[in-house]
Amino acid sequence: MAISRGDKVRIKRPESYWYNDVGTVASIDTSGIRYPVVVRFEKVNYNGISGSEGGINTNNFAQAELEPA
């Protein structure tokens, strides 16, 4: 599966807050890390962090945890 920046992908990691949601690939790291694909979502998650309104709207995933949407 060849995923590239800007592609719409569906999340297939069952424990993820965004499971079965669709997001946009923001970047792909090629250095060999475990979760190289950064995906950006429209909605934020439930973790509010200091300095942001509401929560986080990006997360890292392995390519095997994604499918084209």
Curated annotation (Swiss-Prot):
Keyword annotations for this protein? Membrane, Photosynthesis, Photosystem I, Thylakoid
Which family would the database say this protein is a member of?
A: Belongs to the PsaE family.
Which NCBIfam families does the record associate with it? Answer: PRK02749.1
User: According to its record, how does it sit in the membrane?
Assistant: Peripheral membrane protein
Please give the name of this protein: Photosystem I reaction center subunit IV
Q: Name one GO biological process term.
A: photosynthesis
Q: What does this protein do?
A: Stabilizes the interaction between PsaC and the PSI core, assists the docking of the ferredoxin to PSI and interacts with ferredoxin-NADP oxidoreductase.
Q: Where in the cell is it found?
A: Cellular thylakoid membrane
The gene designation is psaE
Gene Ontology CC entries for this record: photosystem I reaction center; plasma membrane-derived thylakoid membrane
Native organism: Synechococcus sp. (strain CC9311)
Pfam families in the cross-refs:
PSI_PsaE
